Amino acid sequence: MADRGCPLEAAPLPAEVRESLAELELELSEGDITQKGYEKKRAKLLARYIPLIQGIDPSLQAENRIPGPSQTTAAAPKQQKSRPTASRDERFRSDVHTEAVQAALAKYKERKMPMPSKRRSVLVHSSVETYTPPDTSSASEDEGSLRRPGRLTSTPLQSHSSVEPWLDRVIQGSSTSSSASSTSSHPGGRPTTAPSAAATPGAAATTALAGLEAHTHIDLHSAPPDVTTGLVEHSYFERPQVASVRSVPRGCSGSMLETADGVPVNSRVSSKIQQLLNTLKRPKRPPLKEFFVDDFEELLEVQQPDPNQPKPEGSETSVLRGEPLTAGVPRPPSLLATLQRWGTTQPKSPCLTALDTTGKAVYTLTYGKLWSRSLKLAYTLLNKLTSKNEPLLKPGDRVALVFPNSDPVMFMVAFYGCLLAELVPVPIEVPLTRKDAGSQQVGFLLGSCGVFLALTTDACQKGLPKAQTGEVAAFKGWPPLSWLVIDGKHLAKPPKDWHPLAQDTGTGTAYIEYKTSKEGSTVGVTVSHASLLAQCRALTQACGYSEAETLTNVLDFKRDAGLWHGVLTSVMNRMHVVSVPYALMKANPLSWIQKVCFYKARAALVKSRDMHWSLLAQRGQRDVSLSSLRMLIVADGANPWSISSCDAFLNVFQSRGLRPEVICPCASSPEALTVAIRRPPDLGGPPPRKAVLSMNGLSYGVIRVDTEEKLSVLTVQDVGQVMPGANVCVVKLEGTPYLCKTDEVGEICVSSSATGTAYYGLLGITKNVFEAVPVTTGGAPIFDRPFTRTGLLGFIGPDNLVFIVGKLDGLMVTGVRRHNADDVVATALAVEPMKFVYRGRIAVFSVTVLHDDRIVLVAEQRPDASEEDSFQWMSRVLQAIDSIHQVGVYCLALVPANTLPKAPLGGIHISETKQRFLEGTLHPCNVLMCPHTCVTNLPKPRQKQPEVGPASMIVGNLVAGKRIAQASGRELAHLEDSDQARKFLFLADVLQWRAHTTPDHPLFLLLNAKGTVTSTATCVQLHKRAERVAAALMEKGRLSVGDHVALVYPPGVDLIAAFYGCLYCGCVPVTVRPPHPQNLGTTLPTVKMIVEVSKSACVLTTQAVTRLLRSKEAAAAVDIRTWPTILDTDDIPKKKIASVFRPPSPDVLAYLDFSVSTTGILAGVKMSHAATSALCRSIKLQCELYPSRQIAICLDPYCGLGFALWCLCSVYSGHQSVLVPPLELESNVSLWLSAVSQYKARVTFCSYSVMEMCTKGLGAQTGVLRMKGVNLSCVRTCMVVAEERPRIALTQSFSKLFKDLGLPARAVSTTFGCRVNVAICLQGTAGPDPTTVYVDMRALRHDRVRLVERGSPHSLPLMESGKILPGVKVIIAHTETKGPLGDSHLGEIWVSSPHNATGYYTVYGEEALHADHFSARLSFGDTQTIWARTGYLGFLRRTELTDASGGRHDALYVVGSLDETLELRGMRYHPIDIETSVIRAHRSIAECAVFTWTNLLVVVVELDGLEQDALDLVALVTNVVLEEHYLVVGVVVIVDPGVIPINSRGEKQRMHLRDGFLADQLDPIYVAYNM
């Protein structure tokens, strides 16, 4: 233990002083005395010896395990820091490592890092059970074995001999004697000829540590959790229909932080984001190549190796041969022959003693009983189980053995019974529930092995989960099984002359042992009869087993060393095995030592966990003696962290008769069985060794002995020599199995007759593992027989001893470096281990995100841990891992105590934990993601190249044979001269004409929630109501021509009458959505703003709304004294007006159309009379609207196309409109569809909100609707009115769902309009169906269109937005050069049409909107036409389809609004694409919205599930955005359903959401700031 650097090591201390010190250590460790008390007592004990100790050179420490005469047998413990409480969670622990971690942490400056915000309800998230019996669980599948008992590691003197001189020889190879001498004169020095990079690992590490201060500085004392409660009350169901405009404060003080658009921010949120930004501004670790390029500057490339990384320099290794198997004593030809021999010649000899949970021996199985009962079982299996007079089982069939860990006797009988019957036993764990951790994979194993029968005991079967029939339940993923109980009374006695035919010497399968891989898949390793026999013989020779010896077995007897030693080899040697069950170990950790003492056992089989547990429980047990032991086999010696348990155990129990040479670590793997085992000196074993290795070197697969730099080292002990008769070599991990160099870590491979032979039934993966052919550098095979890969990583050291530094299953490869999961666990536990992690339960694994392994650490926190503790611990763990391993942790999650899935005999079920993490069912209570520091292989930020000029672009397109992207709707017939055109120029004239010619023709029908007609309007009724409104405006309102009037009405006929009333008296109407009574605070300011901004001289409304506008509640939201005149039109007198106002010119303003954009900008556009009638005419032609038609409209009537369809089109075309207010659907979802069916509407319009409501609300009710007679076969076109990219998923699911009600598959389409032109595209009744194309989303980010096949990676479906309307011309122009673009090129959609709006009346929220929106000209080509810029990106594509006019059809595809796009890393992202990915990430995500804040991407998700599941989403959201969009999410905000504001068109108001977030008004469930 040279690395412990203990100054006390050379001083002889009397045994009683050593014992007192050990007890003192333990009292401190269990919290019985304080640190101060401990130091006082310790000083007193050591006072007499201190002078002897001072000044001894540590390099002179003795290094042999077997003490010579001059050496004493133990040393005093080192002084340690206090450990607050007693617990058994001290795993993976080592003093040196703990000190290293604390030293590393001390180097960090305290930096501010934002602490996650959590709602109080989420804080109350306690453990499943606050206390369970001690169960130290490890992150490895080795049942929690890996612990480094911390303060108990009093460094023993009989320390291992050092590996350093050997390694130096190895690396030098044939270096000269002078360099060798120079090396030997400096312990651990390097030859002068070695490259400088390798020569100074210490210096390099110091530099690295200095560099550490440049990043990951994390504040350990952040602000307390940000708990925001009750700020905004949102109903769970009703989404606030926010159309409110973002108010812009004027004249704010300069010091006040403002958002990009001037929203004042003084909240905690923004200060946290500031902290986060400050953290992120620090430089990242530089050496890794940060970016990559490909044809799209997009494919992630492998990171380039660091030129300074250590490289192996030794010579090539060779095959290491174990000693030959001794011929010696003649042995029986097979294990069954041996069993028969002992069963008949030594029937009374004890074979196996089973203990109960109190430690009492409940039954001793003799060899006679084992033989007779196994025979009985074999006979029963072969002769008494029949189906249809056929024997159920044939030789070679596989049979599952399901026995609890407490019943070794029945297991042994079953195992040998199967062997005698020539059946193949497949031992598995007892299933405890229907859905145990890993149950599905056990099912896969049973299925792949073709198992259909399971053997068990009566007691065990009673305890299995049952189905309602009383039968054993069907377990998740398992094949159908028959269960056979094999207790004595169920077995038949064989006739005297019956003998089994067992052939058990050849290559036939003897048994199958299960193995769970890193990814969680469970496979069966086939062990042949020959291998089984060879293994027993090799173990007998290596361990020197002899007849009638007693072995105490603490391991699981169903598999691994517990099976090989305790069930198989023991029988070969007629040994007596005392089996200690797991339950007894948990109740009394000293039980195995007591049994060793009681039975005078010569050998014991344990794991380091068992040694550690007994250390914690050994006080007061002075009467135990371990002097009978000649071998204490440590089965998990292959775990590098087992060394501490071994040393600490020896330190304490040496005084109780334990000899140092007795401790024998071994290494094994399911595929190769036992690989190596340390032999005691009397069996010819060399002295034990240990190596202190640089973790940095190991991460590059290179062995470097570390001397100076103790911060990141791994101390490993040898696992002895290879097995007798085996050949072992070390090969490279990836690619062809080339032999490693002597100073290189590789995978240990074994060639021997005693290994497994295959993965049962899985030929594909068998070949790679069981038939490896290692080759030399020159490519020549090294041996004539194939090797088996063990999955163990290590090297061959001095004296041909094997050293293991990790397992392939625990390997995480980040970039070019390799890290071992167990090492990371050890580092995390060294950070205040006792205080925080519940029973040391930590799982570390890697997940692949963006083509690289990312490290995830999950720990159980103590039930009493506060938020502050959690955050502080997480911060420190990140620093420690960064410092010790130089690697970032991608995600750190804390879960409540007792919630991680457990492996069968203790330990954490890693693969199940990983599965839950990826599925979002882990339910953490704290999460910290650090993608910014870990993800260094993002694509290169896009550098904008100087653009090609517009002229060159046109020429380029011509040369390429591409047409200019331009398209137009049908030509409008020249009706300007005719009567009708003049007559239809003004809508007021049209209404009067209709009232005169067809007075009783019904125009409007308004439905309520019950589907009954609440009001109607014929032509004459509407005319008369309009006259009354006009008279009231002129008389009561005293308005003059040209005044603006705000119409604040709920959807209905009153609104239409008020509109025409305004036209009749020459006023300009402005439709405004009335405020929501339950949500006045957010909706009333918008009303007030539109009234003020539109300069309305009067407000027309109903009595109910008038009361609302003047109410006390309204006064709290706005200044109600400043309303203009408010007129209610409920009871206005019947009056005529002298004459209807006729505008002097068609270009006079007809109405103002105000709308809030999704970016929160309130924009009003001017519509002239000419544009209004042109709009109506275009829609009439496209939809073939005549007076005989009925159309159903379920839209909000306040702006855009919704307003035009509700108020204008019926009057112009004369068709009847069935009006369905969308609000009514909240109380009757089927209202709209029932109306469509009832009125047999051929054409219907709705919004996305309506469509979504129907899809979600009526999904399960189509049958009920059909019975009510709802039939949608009348519909020819159902159009979604939208100002966005078509939502394909929604329209498709709507079509699919209502196909059952007769809705034609081709009926659903979308419209497209925007502020400059409310109706550009609309499907109509004629022409081809809308087409869908698939584009590459990555190309889209670079403003390019690349058409791909459906289903190809990164493909995005885009549906054509209906057909271009008559009279409308569209061209695609470059956003910056304003030049025309070619077919299928992405650019801004420009539109020219008689119904374009004539300009903005006003824009509020961003006054700098360009004046050229309505009067743009191309910079090249046709520079005369006046175009309006829509502000939307899209492309035109000529299809193969034929238009109504006979020409080829041009399809317009809308990609998204330019205002909404996010510019990140030089690329253009559309929020909807990121949101779609996020919504797909987890079933609990109901809705999602993204926005940026100071270059950080903020993702807000609505959680439709339990609050305690909220944190599952953080990692999934981060993963999916990285994977699919190559973006790092900065902040994840989890909110309640309905928090994301949505406008009447169903569009997300992302900027309102952003303002709400920054002003701390969202009342989030959780806010995670990704580091």
From Swiss-Prot:
The modification Phosphothreonine is found at residues 132, 155. GO terms for molecular function: acetate-CoA ligase activity. Residues 60-203, 302-327 are annotated as: Disordered. A motif (PXXP motif) lies at residues 283-286, 307-310. It is found in: Cell membrane; Mitochondrion; Cell projection, Dendritic spine. SUPFAM superfamilies: Acetyl-CoA synthetase-like. InterPro entries: AMP-bd_C (IPR025110), AMP-bd_C_sf (IPR045851), AMP-dep_synth/lig_dom (IPR000873), ANL_N_sf (IPR042099), Dip2-like_dom (IPR037337), DMAP1-bd (IPR010506). Catalyzes the de novo synthesis of acetyl-CoA in vitro. Promotes acetylation of CTTN, possibly by providing the acetyl donor, ensuring correct dendritic spine morphology and synaptic transmission. Binds to follistatin-related protein FSTL1 and may act as a cell surface receptor for FSTL1, contributing to AKT activation and subsequent FSTL1-induced survival and function of endothelial cells and cardiac myocytes. Residues 174-203 have a biased composition (Low complexity). The modification Phosphoserine is found at residue 94. The gene is DIP2A. This is Disco-interacting protein 2 homolog A. It comes from Homo sapiens (Human). It is an enzyme of class 6 (ligase).
